[in-house]
Protein backbone atom coordinates (compact mmCIF):
# COMPACT_ATOMS: atom_id res chain seq x y z
CA UNK A 1 0.00 0.00 0.00
CA UNK A 2 2.75 2.43 0.97
CA UNK A 3 4.53 2.12 -2.38
CA UNK A 4 1.28 2.04 -4.38
CA UNK A 5 0.27 5.29 -2.68
CA UNK A 6 3.35 6.92 -4.22
CA UNK A 7 5.48 7.33 -1.12
CA UNK A 8 9.19 7.33 -1.90
CA UNK A 9 10.88 7.64 1.50
CA UNK A 10 12.31 4.19 2.10
CA UNK A 11 13.57 4.69 5.68
CA UNK A 12 11.92 3.04 8.68
CA UNK A 13 11.76 4.29 12.22
CA UNK A 14 8.97 3.82 14.68
CA UNK A 15 7.23 5.61 17.48
CA UNK A 16 8.33 4.16 20.81
CA UNK A 17 11.01 2.15 18.96
CA UNK A 18 8.70 -0.83 18.46
CA UNK A 19 10.76 -1.94 15.46
CA UNK A 20 13.33 -3.43 17.86
CA UNK A 21 10.77 -5.65 19.60
CA UNK A 22 11.93 -9.05 18.36
CA UNK A 23 8.53 -10.30 17.19
CA UNK A 24 8.11 -7.14 15.08
CA UNK A 25 11.78 -6.95 14.10
CA UNK A 26 11.91 -10.49 12.68
CA UNK A 27 8.91 -9.85 10.39
CA UNK A 28 9.96 -6.30 9.55
CA UNK A 29 13.39 -7.31 8.26
CA UNK A 30 11.78 -9.57 5.63
CA UNK A 31 9.52 -6.71 4.56
CA UNK A 32 12.47 -4.30 4.31
CA UNK A 33 14.55 -6.63 2.16
CA UNK A 34 11.65 -7.67 -0.07
CA UNK A 35 10.18 -4.21 -0.73
CA UNK A 36 13.24 -2.09 -1.48
CA UNK A 37 13.61 -0.17 1.76
CA UNK A 38 17.03 1.44 2.13
CA UNK A 39 17.48 2.04 5.84
CA UNK A 40 16.10 1.58 9.33
CA UNK A 41 16.78 3.49 12.53
CA UNK A 42 19.24 1.91 14.94
CA UNK A 43 18.25 0.89 18.43
CA UNK A 44 19.47 3.42 20.98
CA UNK A 45 23.05 2.33 21.58
CA UNK A 46 24.49 5.14 23.70
CA UNK A 47 22.91 5.95 27.04
CA UNK A 48 24.17 8.00 29.94
CA UNK A 49 22.07 5.89 32.31
CA UNK A 50 22.70 2.27 33.14
CA UNK A 51 20.72 -0.44 31.38
CA UNK A 52 20.60 -4.12 32.19
CA UNK A 53 23.25 -6.38 30.71
CA UNK A 54 20.53 -8.37 28.92
CA UNK A 55 19.11 -5.24 27.30
CA UNK A 56 22.64 -4.11 26.35
CA UNK A 57 23.45 -7.38 24.54
CA UNK A 58 20.00 -7.54 22.96
CA UNK A 59 20.49 -4.05 21.48
CA UNK A 60 23.96 -5.02 20.28
CA UNK A 61 22.45 -8.04 18.50
CA UNK A 62 19.65 -5.98 16.91
CA UNK A 63 22.02 -3.19 15.87
CA UNK A 64 24.39 -5.68 14.25
CA UNK A 65 21.50 -6.70 11.98
CA UNK A 66 20.54 -3.07 11.36
CA UNK A 67 24.14 -2.04 10.53
CA UNK A 68 24.23 -4.86 7.98
CA UNK A 69 20.96 -3.73 6.42
CA UNK A 70 21.91 -0.02 6.45
CA UNK A 71 25.34 -0.70 4.92
CA UNK A 72 23.61 -0.88 1.53
CA UNK A 73 22.67 2.83 1.66
CA UNK A 74 25.28 5.58 1.13
CA UNK A 75 23.77 7.88 3.78
CA UNK A 76 22.67 5.53 6.53
CA UNK A 77 25.66 3.22 6.42
CA UNK A 78 27.62 6.05 8.05
CA UNK A 79 25.32 6.29 11.09
CA UNK A 80 26.94 4.45 13.98
CA UNK A 81 25.15 5.85 17.03
CA UNK A 82 21.58 6.65 18.01
CA UNK A 83 21.23 8.62 21.23
CA UNK A 84 19.21 11.28 23.00
CA UNK A 85 20.42 14.86 23.05
CA UNK A 86 21.06 14.69 26.82
CA UNK A 87 23.33 11.69 26.26
CA UNK A 88 25.13 13.61 23.52
CA UNK A 89 25.71 16.58 25.84
CA UNK A 90 26.97 14.41 28.71
CA UNK A 91 29.22 12.06 26.78
CA UNK A 92 32.11 12.51 24.38
CA UNK A 93 31.58 13.65 20.82
CA UNK A 94 30.23 11.06 18.43
CA UNK A 95 30.87 11.20 14.72
CA UNK A 96 28.02 10.01 12.54
CA UNK A 97 25.31 10.00 15.17
CA UNK A 98 21.55 10.34 14.89
CA UNK A 99 20.30 12.38 17.83
CA UNK A 100 16.76 11.84 19.08
CA UNK A 101 14.69 14.94 19.77
CA UNK A 102 10.94 15.02 20.46
CA UNK A 103 9.77 18.60 19.80
CA UNK A 104 6.76 19.88 21.72
CA UNK A 105 5.26 23.33 22.27
CA UNK A 106 5.04 24.31 25.95
CA UNK A 107 3.70 27.76 26.82
CA UNK A 108 4.31 28.88 23.24
CA UNK A 109 7.95 27.72 23.22
CA UNK A 110 9.23 24.82 21.11
CA UNK A 111 11.29 22.51 23.31
CA UNK A 112 12.11 18.82 23.65
CA UNK A 113 9.67 16.62 25.54
CA UNK A 114 12.53 15.28 27.67
CA UNK A 115 13.85 18.74 28.58
CA UNK A 116 13.31 20.18 32.03
CA UNK A 117 10.14 22.08 31.24
CA UNK A 118 10.71 24.46 34.14
CA UNK A 119 14.03 25.63 32.71
CA UNK A 120 12.53 27.54 29.75
CA UNK A 121 15.04 25.71 27.56
CA UNK A 122 13.84 26.02 23.98
CA UNK A 123 14.78 23.83 21.05
CA UNK A 124 17.12 26.48 19.64
CA UNK A 125 19.05 26.50 22.96
CA UNK A 126 19.29 22.70 22.83
CA UNK A 127 20.55 22.75 19.24
CA UNK A 128 23.08 25.47 20.08
CA UNK A 129 24.38 23.41 23.02
CA UNK A 130 24.83 20.45 20.72
CA UNK A 131 26.55 22.49 18.00
CA UNK A 132 29.02 23.83 20.58
CA UNK A 133 30.29 20.25 20.99
CA UNK A 134 31.01 19.77 17.29
Tell what function each PLM region has:
Residues 1-11, 21-134:
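Terminal accessory/targeting
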Residues 15-19:
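Short, internal active-site loops enriched in acidic
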